[in-house]
Amino acid sequence: ADEAAAAKPAAPADNAPVPLKHGKGTVLIVDDEDDLRRVAQMILKRCGYECVECDNGQDAIKIYQSLYRTGTPPDVVLMDLTLRGGMNGTETASEILALDRDARIVCTSGSVTQEVQMVFLERGFVGVLPKPYEAGELTQTVHRVATAMRRSA
């Protein structure tokens, strides 16, 4: 009986990795952790996305402004709450939303409770991606936000 049980394929575990989701579009990655930015960029590029990245709010606003003025704003902004320089992620997101109220900003943070998520959504973020995240969670979130943006455009 044990041999028969062993021959059956295992049911997918609840903690099985989320599959990667391929797509198109531009993603602005704003995070003070250099390694995390590099890994996120590598994963997203492999899945078909173009990426621009920086580690502080001032650069994020400049990059967004520049792309917005050329008519090609990022499809998704991944915004960490802790950034280098003087501005945090919430302040940076507010500045970007003042420039483009249709900006699609996803909060990435390691300290996100249900209440905190609600505050971010009220402030104009379109989603929250808790850290640490898996490659599949990253690509699924980016795909969902990028395609939702294109539908409303």
Can you annotate each of these PLM segments?
Residues 30-33, 54, 77, 108:
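Conserved sequence signature across two-component system core domains
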Residues 2-9, 143-153:
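The C-terminal output helix
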Residues 38-46:
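Charged docking surfaces used in two-component/phosphorelay signaling
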Residues 1-28, 65-69, 119:
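Disordered, acidic interdomain junction associated with two-component signaling
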Residues 80-82:
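Active-site residues of response regulator receiver
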Residues 55, 84-87:
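Hydrophobic residue at a beta-alpha junction
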Residues 87-99, 104-130, 136, 140:
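Alpha4 helix (beta4-alpha4-beta5 surface) of REC/receiver domains from two-component response regulators
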Residues 48-63, 129, 141:
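Short hydrophobic/Thr-rich beta-strand motif most characteristic of the beta2 strand and flanking loop
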